[in-house]
Amino acid sequence: MDTTLQDPLVGQVLDGRYRVDARIAVGGMATVYRAVDTRLDRVLALKVMHPSLAADASFVERFIREAKSVARLAHPNVVQVFDQGTDGAYVYLAMEYIAGCTLRDVLRERGALQPRAALDILEPVLAALGAAHRAGFVHRDMKPENVLIGDDGRVKVADFGLVRAVDSVTNTTGTVLGTVSYLAPEQIEHGTADPRVDVYACGILLYEMLTGEKPHDGDSPAIVLYKHLHDDVPPPSAAVPGMAYELDELVASATARGPEVRPHDAVALLARARDARARLGDEQLDAVPPQALASEHDNADDRTSVIPRALTVRRPLPVNEEDEGADAAHRTSRFRSPPPLPPRGRTALRRGPMAIVIGVLLVLGLGAGVWYINSGQFTKVPPLLAKTEKEARDRLADAGLDAGQVSEAYSDTVERGSVATDPEAGARIRTNDSVSLTLSKGPRTVRVPDLDGYPQDKARSLLEDEGLKPGMSTREFSDSVPAGSVISTEPGKGTEVRAGSAVALTVSKGAPVDVPDVAGDDLEDARAELEEAGLEVKVATERVTSEYDAGRVARQDPGPGGRVAEGDTVTLTLSKGPEMAEVPDVVGDSVGEAREKLEGAGFRVDEDRGLLGLFGDTVKGQSVDGGDSAPKGSTITIEIR
């Protein structure tokens, strides 16, 4: 069912001006609609805050003030804010409508991007953030969902001002706003934010574009937050072998855990990004990343969230682990006492106190029995993650449990020697039962196979058979390896790596071919010579004037002496003949005057003095008569007597 049809705003006119046509997206703080400004007759995007936030008067006040400030931020890479207002319970922003998609859509469809494409997106994002930083704004919620890519290729940053307004409120409520995958450590630990939190988020953004995955991931937001605080962002080349070192440096500088080590704002990071691009060659910029599907995307992790700042982020516990103290504090048991007996005269009165005592004892006994049946004979498996076998046995004994069978298994997430439990931590189990322990052997490792000389497709298949991923492919000339076959791998053959790692391939372009010089040749002769050298020939449709006769080769690309691969194409541009010019009449002129006229008309000049003209200075004749035409650049001989 189309949920747009159920949205109460669709079809309404907000503030007597904005007609809501369709719902575009729903986020953690607002819903975005496509709307029409009925006064100006233009399509725009209308962002309407969720009622739970719009009901906060202090939020609305700050939001309006911030929105007005951001509306003055004019930059070609910032989504423009046209208007802000309220209509009853609705608080809205009227913004520029961008027909296109988000960076998240691109990553979901394509996975990793080529370095050139990643930098083409990153640089306008940093330009937009740099303008905001210099104007005193911090975005605070940079993520692929807030990078819009128009159908015309323009890159724009959305949601300026919105996150700042919400953060102004959350500073007073002890919370931090943001999307956990892109939060800087200082945002998590102290709730502080300056331009360097945007720099950090852009570093994560670049890593994700280059590798197709996030640097820190986990089963819960708490695990991701812990990794941001305690783990460095790995270099992109660890996920995509062969990635240029300059890109590793760029990501590392932007994602340093200490804010004082990062570039101080987006302008500084933009300068570093442009410097990195300048130091990369075309092969590095256009290197094709592994053709893998984009990683599964969890929308919940990329939704802007309000995170309690008071939360101390500890080493993440297993998903099912519970805090027993908290559980007990919130658990209440209720027992019903039997109804009072009706009075039965004096004997009943005398036996009343005894009956009450017996009744209470019966209730307590019944309650204890119920407790034992339901809870007393059970205990919880204590958390054993990251414990040694001895520590795990001791903790089990303290909980009244025995250690059962101990086995070993590979794990990509649990360190070597650490313990995972079965049943899992927090599970209810009968007292004195045994718990099987699984001891991690660490990640499974494999050796990079010897792929030298294999065709590229076969090499990729062999890597996948070994549990490895094909990495980036670069191409080089080789006199010994046939074109299309593997020259080498990175890491090299025999290297022990983690299963699932990517291996970069260097593929042969074959032996280089020296391009012969065919300028000035007849087309058929030139074609024959190039094809004999193993090259393809393409003839340009446009002809140019040159010193060569019409129909002959005027120029070639690549030029003579260039090194290309067998089968590459050489483009020939044919001559339409030399450019003609009228020859000036210089008979009777002095030598100096004649030379000036002829050279001014585009000709070269040669002098024929003979024996009689050794000391003369007057032109008595010329090789091409005055008024006739001759090719520009040709030589006119003057006779001097």
Swiss-Prot record:
Classification via Gene3D superfamilies: 3.30.10.20, Phosphorylase Kinase, domain 1, Transferase(Phosphotransferase) domain 1
Region feature Disordered, mapped onto this chain: 317-347, 469-494
EC code: 2.7.11.1
Domain Protein kinase, residue spans: 18-280
Binding sites annotated in the UniProt record for ATP: 24-32, 47
Record note on modification: Autophosphorylated on threonine residue(s).
Keyword entries, A-Z: ATP-binding, Kinase, Nucleotide-binding, Phosphoprotein, Repeat, Serine/threonine-protein kinase, Transferase
CDD domains reported in the protein's UniProt record: PASTA_pknB, STKc_PknB_like
Enzyme class, first EC level, given as a word: transferase
Keyword Repeat part of the UniProt annotation: yes
Superkingdom of this protein's organism: Bacteria
Catalyzed reactions per annotation: L-seryl-[protein] + ATP = O-phospho-L-seryl-[protein] + ADP + H(+); L-threonyl-[protein] + ATP = O-phospho-L-threonyl-[protein] + ADP + H(+)
A GO molecular function held by the record: protein serine/threonine kinase activity
Residue ranges occupied by any PASTA domain in the UniProt entry: 375-441, 442-508, 509-576, 577-641
Residues of the active site: 141 (proton acceptor)
Similarity remark: Belongs to the protein kinase superfamily. Ser/Thr protein kinase family.
Name by which UniProt lists this protein: Serine/threonine-protein kinase PK-1
Organism: Streptomyces toyocaensis
High-level lineage: Bacteria, Bacillati, Actinomycetota, Actinomycetes, Kitasatosporales
UniProt gene name: spk1
